């Protein structure tokens, strides 16, 4: 059922947006514009606002603490850390090519695992050897932290690498699993929801990381360079 207060807020926000656009401004400030709305109304209104701004050619600055909201509306997103701009980029690049460990851990979901650089684009980890699509300036043998997103881990019944399911969250089309490796390290993985694994079960997994993100481990210094 539709919450009446949320529906009233929806009408109010549409009216406020119409009034703000009436003078045909070149730049519009949107400060938490979708707060107090339920999930479905928030998603629908955010898409409508983006379409309206695009159609009118109006630039806007959106201030929000909601990542999903920022990604849905914005072409470029800035991530701030204690008042400092960490990265200004597209939503895609913020997720797949974070400029710092803070951005990597703040945007989306993911875990860092320790690894050793074997070559400019190859890392040895407890998950095996991972091949990347970029080169790093760190010397071979350097200790690095590898970011793995839930969509980087895929089920593989034939894999020698086994992980134990320690938690699960049903998302509808997919299920988010929390996995524990034999070393005790934990990762998250998204599997199709028709594969209904249970906590305590062992599953075969492998890494399928199209965008390998690597940072120098604490205590080492190196730069990251795209191929």
Features from the language model and the residues they span:
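Internal alpha/beta loop-helix hairpins
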Residues: 54, 59, 64-128
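Non-catalytic connector elements of ABC transporters
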Residues: 110-112, 120-227
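Single conserved hydrophobic/aromatic residue that forms the stacking wall/gate
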Residues: 1-8, 12
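Helical segment within the ABC ATPase nucleotide-binding domain
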Residues: 42-56
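Conserved signature/switch motifs of ABC ATPase nucleotide-binding domains
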Residues: 19, 23
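ABC-family nucleotide-binding domains
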Residues: 38
């Amino acid at each position: 059922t539709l919450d009446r207060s949320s529906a009233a807020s929806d009408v109010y926000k549409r009216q406020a947006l119409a009034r703000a656009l009436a003078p045909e401004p070149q730049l519009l400030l949107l400060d938490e514009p979708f707060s107090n709305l339920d999930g479905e109304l928030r998603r629908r209104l955010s898409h409508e606002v983006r379409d309206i701004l695009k159609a009118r050619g109006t630039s806007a600055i959106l201030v929000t603490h909601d990542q999903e909201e920022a990604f849905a509306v914005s072409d470029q997103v800035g991530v701030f850390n204690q008042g400092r701009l960490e990265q200004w980029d597209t939503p895609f690049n913020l997720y797949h090519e974070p400029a710092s460990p803070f951005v990597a851990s703040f945007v989306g979901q993911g875990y860092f695992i320790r690894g050793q650089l074997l070559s400019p684009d190859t890392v040895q980890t407890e998950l095996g050897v991972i091949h990347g699509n970029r080169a790093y300036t760190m010397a071979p043998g350097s200790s690095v932290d590898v970011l793995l997103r839930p969509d980087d881990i895929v089920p593989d019944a034939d894999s020698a690498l086994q992980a134990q399911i320690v938690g699960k969250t049903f998302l509808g089309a997919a299920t988010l699993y929390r996995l524990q490796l034999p070393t005790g390290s934990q990762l998250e993985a998204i599997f199709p929801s028709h594969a209904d694994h249970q906590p305590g079960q062992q599953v075969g997994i492998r890494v399928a990381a199209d965008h390998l993100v690597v940072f120098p481990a604490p205590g080492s210094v190196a730069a990251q360079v795209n191929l």
